[in-house]
């Protein structure tokens, strides 16, 4: 048993933990910047978490273990002076222009500057930002005038993806962050997943914005602008309007999109149901033809880049069904014009995504037909929130409305795509019905749900048993492959999501304060919104979506055949 005193209060504990964690667990506030829970920074130390230990002096709380007899002061004059001095030093390398900054509402550094009344000794105000800003990537933007060199992006990349694509670099004697040899991230092993952006406490890292594309289209009279949001957006955007975590705001988003001026409001959940129609059909065909196995999902562009960069031998095993975003985009330029009488050239398709890698996917050269892009612009959850705020739309007070029916209806299977295991479960619901030519009532595959890194299950289809696996996060895919598990048994179907927790934890989602992350399992809470929708929808299988059935009957024909196979599939190659 250890006895310690913090700010005059005695605690008894058996824990072996750091001063920072123990203090926060006991509601004692200690400021921090470089520290992220479960992602400790062993590269750069910001020293913002400095505390004073009697007999020892000033120490950093994030990496100093508590010891019996410690007397700790978190708010002494020496502590406050040290922290203020460090913040002032950081201000000397940080462009302190908060007005136009996209992080001004949730900038962790700004809060520290205000709290400690810090000032720069020599303000950093570059006249020409060209050498500091890297916008070459289709997904990510780096603004080094904002970078504090805290190392959170480097550590988050290493822990969450194990690609170590984000690095500290030496440029003319100065330390910067970037890709190896200052290459464009797209030309490296980077997954473009955006976990580095989520980790960044300031605006040094952000998504490549498509907002100007969208605004220009909305202001072009000849353009018919349609929009569709991904499943996870409805589970998170409320956080950016002070509505708390885990609030379903589907109807409010539809209303806000109409007020922004979009001509038609559809839903990517419809695209998810389309993907399942094709993917489940493909799985059944492989079962009937005895392979090739395993079939991997292909709807996560971060995972696709991981396969391309590290395991190109697996590309032939990826499902050829387009992702919900791309398959929706294809339908928006073919089926939708056929029922609306519009010229496909005038249809401008926008998606709202929780993912930065979706921007890269949408801009792949092959993702077009007859010169028309499947998707014209991709905005993240954060970008949509900014558009709503810029338009002064009172989001939290909006009445709910519905999506437009032609491509806005969706099933519970489409809704759960945003959670790890959701694609697997949705596909199995339809594949089992297709293979057994029945409408089965037992539709929940809870063994593939949850946040474990590698989940396995055995499913029965037509009295035969099939092995499936769900890989939760890019780092766990590396573990799965390096362990040899893929060769230990015959897997038939494997889902992979690059981001831990799935799309609900994507790189385009709202920033969450690290202190909140220590208290709230954000992945679980956001996913609960999707599972709740699934549970309460009358149609819980993709092939029960009446608007989808109508589309196949009147335009695409049978899933996996003819026109459907020709334009709703894309084969990734080495």
UniProtKB/Swiss-Prot annotation:
* Sequence ranges assigned to domain 4Fe-4S His(Cys)3-ligated-type in this UniProt record: 78-117
InterPro entries from the UniProt entry: 2Fe-2S_ferredoxin-like_sf, 2Fe-2S_ferredoxin-type, 4Fe4S_Fe-S-bd, 4Fe4S_Fe_S_CS, Cytosolic_Fe-S_CAF, Fe_hydrogenase, Fe_hydrogenase_lsu_C, Fe_hydrogenase_ssu
Residues engaged in binding [4Fe-4S] cluster 3: 157, 190, 193, 196
Cite the Pfam families for this sequence: Fe_hyd_lg_C, Fe_hyd_SSU, Fe_hydrogense_Fe-S_bd, Fer2_4, Fer4_7
Provide the coiled-coil residue spans. Answer: none
Q: Which GO terms describe its molecular function?
A: 4 iron, 4 sulfur cluster binding; ferredoxin hydrogenase activity; iron ion binding
Keyword field:
4Fe-4S, Iron, Iron-sulfur, Metal-binding, Oxidoreductase, Repeat
Query: What cofactor does this chain's UniProt record say it requires?
Result: [2Fe-2S] cluster; [4Fe-4S] cluster; Fe(2+)
> Which NCBIfam families does the UniProt record give?
FeFe_hydrog_A, Hydr_FeFe_Clost
Oligomeric form and interacting partners: Monomer.
Spell out the protein name for this chain.
Answer: Iron hydrogenase 1
